[in-house]
Every structure is written in C-alpha cells, then in structure tokens.
Amino acid sequence: MTPFWWAHSRFLNDNIVNSQITSIRRFTDRIPFSKLTDIAPAQVKCLRGDAYAMKSNEVVFGWVVNSDSDVAGEKVTVSSIKNGKYKLMIFHTWRGVFLEEKEVTVTNGTISFGPPYMRITGSQANYIGQDLAFILEPMI
C-alpha cells in the first residue's frame, strides 16, 4: 500500500512514479542508513492489518498497513527495543509528510501508539489512509 506501485501497467507513467518515489525519499532521508549498527527486525504488531519494523542502535523505523480498510484508530505496538525517551515521527506515505512528532517513553522494551485519525492543517483535514510509516529516534 505504499504509494509506489510495484506492478507495471499502461496506467503507470513517470508523473505517478516520480511523485511516489519522492514521497518515499522524504521518509528515508530521515534514516542514516550508512551509520546504522546492530540492525535487526523489531517485533511490531497492530490490531488489524500488517506491520513491519527494523531496529538499530540509532533508530527504529517501520510501516503499518491495512489494505481492507485503513489505519485510523489502529494501535501499533513495537517491542524488543531499548528503554528510554524517543521522538516518535508518524509519516503520511501518500502525501510525503510527517504528520506528527512527539516525545514518547519506551518502558519494558515496548511502546504503543496510535496514528492520528484526521490531522487539521490550516483549513484542511488530512485523512491518514490505509498505511503509515514511523520512525522512533532515541533522544540523547
């Protein structure tokens, strides 16, 4: 469900692909891939749909999707990570923007959070949609 379509069809063109790759790039720009150490899958689950995450000493990042409906009102739980304070950043995959950044605390190796259902920006309400990406960055 990420915006990038992994299938080729006559409806796929440069305008669609370039826009979608740009959205993904805005997310990955925040992850220092070349500096990550001790990279491993993180345990992550959600009430409905699917979730996947990676952890390292520097950052935890993941993706949550519900292709049957949406991720609004979803509860995401990430486990097997280090205790402490983190900056949680929730990313809108279709618009290519971070919707929310807030400080959270990991206790007993676990953090749970929910995506915003609607985000009001100026005079517009932005629906979260069928998927989201997230980053948990340790606060030092």
Positions of PLM-derived features:
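Residue-level detector of conserved, well-ordered beta-strand and adjacent loop positions
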Residues: 114
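Aromatic- and carboxylate-lined catalytic core of secreted/periplasmic carbohydrate-active enzymes
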Residues: 1-102, 120-140
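Short beta-strand edge segments in extracellular beta-sheet folds
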Residues: 105-107
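Short strand-edge motifs at loop-to-beta-strand transitions and within beta-strands
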Residues: 109-111
